[in-house]
C-alpha cells in the first residue's frame, strides 16, 4: 500500500505502527451550518482509504470528530437564541443524515470536542509548565512557536515562519503564535470552569487532545498512523496540531499526513465567504446519494474537483452500466475473478488511484457483457460477475441497490402506480391490436422521462435523467 504523505511531498509505502492495524484521524466539521460538498468529498476520500485498507487485510480504526466549541457556533447560537449544545446537535444530526445518504461507513468513533475538555486543559497545563505557553493580559493563553524548531515543517508555510515580532498591543510574541485557551469575556461568550480559569479551548488543541484520548499509542515516536483532512486545514490547523504535540509530549502527532483537494464551483473555490457553498442536502434534492458519491469519488482525491452537473450526468452512465450488468446476473452464485480483484485492488493501493480502478471496472463491464451476449445461460459466468460487482460495492461503496430500485429512483409510490396502470392499459391496447394507442402511451411516458422495455417476462420501465 502506497500513500501520498503531505509532509514528505511524495508517495511512500504505508508501514503502520502496529503490524496489520491502521489508526486514522480525520478532521470533521465545525457544526454551525449544514455540510457542503467539500465536507462530502473529504469524507468520501478517507472512506475509500478505510475500505481499501480493510480489503487489504488491515484492521482499521477511523475516528472523525465534531468541533462543537467554536466562535462561529457561539455567534450563531447567540443570534438564534440557542445554546451551543442545541445548535451543534442540529448540525451533527444533519451531517450524519447527509453522510448516511452517501453510503459512508460509520467511523469507529465520533468524539465531540466538548467531551474532552479535561484532556485539553491537561495538555495546556503541560505546555505552561514547560514555559512553552504564555498568558496575555486578557487571560488568553498562547503557544510560543519559537520554542518549536520544526514549526512550519508540515505545511512549509514560509509566510508564517518569516513573521517578525509585533507590537505589545496584541501581546503575542510572534505573529504565528496561536491561542490554546480563550478566557471568558462576559456576555455573549461561552466559558467552562477549569484550573486555567473560566474559558474555552482554541480550535487546534481540541483535535490533538481528542487524538490522544481516542487513538494514541504508547511508547512510539508517532502517536497515530494517519492524520487526514481537507487541504484547507494544512495551515494553520494541522501545522499547529503537530507543533503543540511536539512541544507538550516530545513526539510527532502522526506518521503520515494526507489531504484531499478542494471542490470548485464553476472553476471558483467553494467557500461560504464567496456565497457559493453547495450544501449536500440541496444536492440530494436533485440526485440520489449514490449518484453523488459515484461522481465525487471519480476524481483523484488530491486533485481539485470542479463540480458541474454535466460531468455528474456523464459519471452516472458508469453506474447505469453497473446496474444493467447486475440486472442480467441477479440470483446467481459464484466466486470472484481473482485477477479482477487483484488488479483493481492494486490500483487503489497506489494512493487510491481510483481513475485507474474505474478503468479496470469499465473494461470488466464491457468484456463480461460481450461474454453474456454470446452465452446468456452461463451460470458460472453470471456468478463470477455478481461476485465481482459485490467486491466493487465493498471497495467503492457503489452498486449496492437492487437494479429495479436504482432505475426507478425519484419516482414516488403513487407515480409508480400510475405508470403500472399505463403499462397495463398499453398491454390491453396491444392485445386489441390498437397499436396507435399503445404507441401513444409509450410516447406519453417518454415525455415524463419514463422509458418502457418489452422483455419475455413482460414490460419493465426506467426513469431517465
Regions found by a protein language model. Give the residues of each.
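Short, glycine/charge-rich beta-strand/loop segments that flank catalytic centers
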Residues: 66-70, 92-95, 105-120, 138-147
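Short phosphate-binding/catalytic loops that engage adenosine nucleotides
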Residues: 58, 132, 450
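Alpha-helical recognition segments enriched in aromatics with Gly/Pro capping
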Residues: 1-32, 47, 118-332
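N-terminal, positively charged nucleic-acid-binding surface of large information/translation enzymes
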Residues: 8-13, 17-103, 454-461
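Structural preference for alpha-helix termini/caps and helix-kink/transition segments
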Residues: 269-272, 276-465
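Active-site pocket-lining segments that scaffold enzyme catalytic pockets across diverse folds
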Residues: 95, 100-106, 124, 128-133
Amino acid at each position: 500500500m502506497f500513500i501520498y504523505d503531505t509532509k514528505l511531498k511524495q508517495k511512500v509505502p504505508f508501514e503502520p505502527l502496529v503490524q496489520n492495524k491502521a489508526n486514522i484521524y480525520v478532521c470533521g466539521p465545525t457544526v454551525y451550518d449544514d455540510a457542503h460538498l467539500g465536507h462530502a468529498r473529504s469524507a468520501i476520500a478517507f472512506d475509500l482509504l478505510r475500505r481499501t485498507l480493510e480489503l487489504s487485510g488491515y484492521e482499521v480504526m477511523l475516528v472523525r470528530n465534531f468541533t462543537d466549541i467554536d466562535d462561529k457556533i457561539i455567534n450563531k447560537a447567540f443570534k438564534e437564541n440557542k445554546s451551543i449544545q442545541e445548535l451543534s446537535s442540529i448540525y451533527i444530526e444533519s451531517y450524519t443524515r447527509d453522510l448516511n445518504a452517501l453510503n459512508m461507513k460509520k467511523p469507529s468513533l465520533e468524539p465531540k470536542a466538548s467531551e474532552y475538555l479535561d484532556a485539553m486543559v491537561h495538555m495546556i497545563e503541560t505546555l505552561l509548565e514547560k514555559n512553552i505557553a504564555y498568558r496575555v493580559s486578557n487571560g488568553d493563553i498562547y503557544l510560543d512557536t519559537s520554542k518549536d524548531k520544526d514549526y512550519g515543517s508540515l505545511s512549509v508555510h514560509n509566510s508564517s515562519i518569516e513573521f517578525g515580532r509585533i507590537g505589545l498591543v496584541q501581546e503575542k510574541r510572534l505573529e504565528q503564535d496561536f491561542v490554546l485557551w480563550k478566557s471568558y469575556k462576559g456576555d455573549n461568550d461561552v466559558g467552562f470552569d477549569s484550573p486555567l480559569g473560566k474559558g474555552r479551548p482554541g480550535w487546534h488543541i481540541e483535535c490533538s487532545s481528542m487524538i490522544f484520548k481516542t487513538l494514541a499509542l504508547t511508547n512510539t515516536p508517532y502517536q497515530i498512523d494517519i492524520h487526514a483532512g481537507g487541504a484547507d486545514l494544512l495551515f494553520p490547523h494541522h501545522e499547529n496540531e503537530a507543533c503543540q504535540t511536539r512541544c507538550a509530549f516530545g513526539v510527532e502527532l502522526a506518521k503520515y499526513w494526507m489531504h484531499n483537494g478542494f471542490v470548485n464551483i464553476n472553476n471558483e473555490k467553494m467557500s461560504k465567504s464567496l456565497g457559493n457553498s453547495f450544501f449536500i442536502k440541496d444536492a440530494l434534492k436533485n440526485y440520489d446519494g449514490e449518484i453523488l458519491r459515484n461522481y465525487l469519488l471519480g476524481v483523484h482525491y488530491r486533485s481539485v474537483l470542479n463540480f458541474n452537473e454535466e460531468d455528474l450526468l456523464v459519471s452516472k452512465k458508469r453506474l447505469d452500466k453497473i446496474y444493467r450488468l447486475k440486472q442480467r446476473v441477479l440470483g446467481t452464485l459464484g466466486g470472484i475473478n481473482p485477477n479482477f480483484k487483484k488488479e483493481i485492488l492494486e490500483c487503489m493501493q497506489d494512493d487510491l488511484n481510483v481513475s485507474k480502478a474505474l478503468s479496470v471496472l469499465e473494461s470488466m463491464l464491457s468484456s463480461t457483457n460481450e461474454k453474456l451476449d454470446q452465452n446468456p445461460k452461463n451460470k458460472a459466468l453470471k456468478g463470477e460477475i455478481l461476485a465481482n460487482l459485490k467486491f466493487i460495492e465493498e471497495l467503492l461503496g457503489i452498486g449496492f441497490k437492487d437494479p429495479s430500485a436504482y432505475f426507478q429512483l425519484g419516482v414516488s409510490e403513487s407515480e409508480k402506480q400510475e405508470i403500472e396502470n399505463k403499462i397495463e392499459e398499453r398491454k390491453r391496447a396491444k392485445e386489441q391490436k390498437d397499436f396507435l394507442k399503445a404507441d401513444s402511451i409509450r410516447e406519453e411516458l417518454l415525455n415524463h422521462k419514463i422509458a418502457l422495455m418489452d422483455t419475455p417476462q413482460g414490460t419493465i420501465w426506467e426513469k431517465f435523467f
